[in-house]
């Protein structure tokens, strides 16, 4: 008797060993309960800067257009005490752009993320395959936050090559509604999986947008991270900066083109920086609301 794949259960390669545990299901394929998920803790810093419209447009997938000014939100975050990693954590580096996606029947205003890096393969595999997040790998140490001095910073590297730095100074606590920094609107990602073919002749198996936008006709929060029941704090910075360090093939053999593509987005002007810290129910970051959007063509 061969493997039987159960409907309504998530599988990932190697799929023959049964349902795949992760942030969105337990090893038996059922959902985690709030009691099992416990409480997670996170810190998230973002620097916003303006670049050139034509540079941003070059990295927009089919069906996308810029929404508003050509601004980039570069973020560094670290999640701790994650239930699905048995209490472990990891870091994230990402950029977001305010964009509109026009699908076959839907038009969605949101935050498009062209790329994000994460610090553990477990998070990368689950997010790439299940959610369509364009995740890559990096060594991301815990954030360096000093509230007494009002500073925060961090970095990301791979193969001992540091490709990203961020620094904030003059942090002053403010009291605002709990939400992540960024362009606002639903999360938007472009899922692309190549089809196996001789000398790359297969094209792609899938190429479509995924989003946290509720289904048409449904109301609800558009954020993939839910802050119900969260303890949330926020600081505005007097200033912040980022550095994307261009790489060679020898330094980052399979990802230098991505790092350089982000570095090519010229920083014309810094527009603000902020830091948030929150403790929330573990399931808040499961992103179980993500869905596919049917493309126009």
Q: What does each of the following model-derived ranges do?
A:
Residues 112-124:
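Short, solvent-exposed aromatic-acidic interface loops
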Residues 84, 110-112:
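Small-residue-enriched, tightly packed secondary-structure blocks
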Residues 99-103, 160:
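Beta-strand elements of well-folded, non-transmembrane domains
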Residues 23-78:
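N-terminal ordered "arm"
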Residues 43, 91-93, 148-150:
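Residues at beta-strand starts and edge strands
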Residues 66-100:
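Short, structured protein-protein interaction patches enriched in aromatics and acidic/basic residues
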Residues 89-91, 105-109:
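Extended amphipathic alpha-helical segments with heptad-repeat/coiled-coil character used for oligomerization
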Residues 2-29, 128-297:
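Interaction-surface and assembly-scaffold signal
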């Amino acid at each position: 008797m061969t493997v039987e794949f159960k409907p309504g259960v998530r599988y990932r390669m190697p799929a023959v060993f049964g349902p795949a545990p992760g942030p969105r299901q337990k090893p038996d394929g059922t959902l985690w309960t709030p009691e099992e998920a416990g409480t997670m803790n996170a810190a998230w810093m973002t620097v916003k800067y303006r670049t050139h419209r034509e540079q941003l447009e070059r990295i927009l997938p089919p069906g996308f257009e810029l929404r508003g000014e050509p601004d980039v939100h570069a973020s560094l975050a670290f999640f701790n005490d994650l239930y699905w990693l048995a209490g472990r954590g990891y870091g994230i580096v990402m950029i977001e752009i305010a964009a509109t996606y026009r699908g076959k029947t839907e038009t969605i205003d949101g935050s498009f993320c062209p790329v994000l890096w994460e610090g553990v393969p477990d998070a990368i595999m689950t997010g790439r395959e299940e959610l369509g997040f364009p995740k890559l790998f990096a060594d991301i140490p815990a954030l360096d936050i000093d509230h007494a001095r009002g500073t925060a910073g961090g970095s990301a590297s791979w193969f001992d090559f540091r490709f990203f730095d961020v620094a904030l100074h003059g942090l002053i606590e403010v009291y605002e509604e709990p939400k992540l920094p960024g362009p606002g609107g639903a999360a938007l990602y472009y899922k692309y999986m190549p089809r196996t073919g001789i000398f790359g002749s297969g094209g792609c198996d899938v190429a479509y947008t995924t989003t946290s936008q509720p289904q048409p006709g449904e109301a609800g929060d558009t954020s993939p991270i839910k802050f119900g029941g969260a303890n949330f704090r926020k600081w505005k910075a007097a200033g912040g900066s980022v550095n994307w360090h261009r790489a060679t093939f020898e330094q980052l053999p399979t990802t230098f083109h991505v790092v350089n593509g982000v570095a090519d987005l010229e920083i014309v002007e810094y527009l603000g920086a902020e830091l948030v810290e929150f403790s929330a129910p573990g399931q808040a970051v499961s992103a179980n609301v993500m869905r596919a959007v049917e493309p126009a063509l």
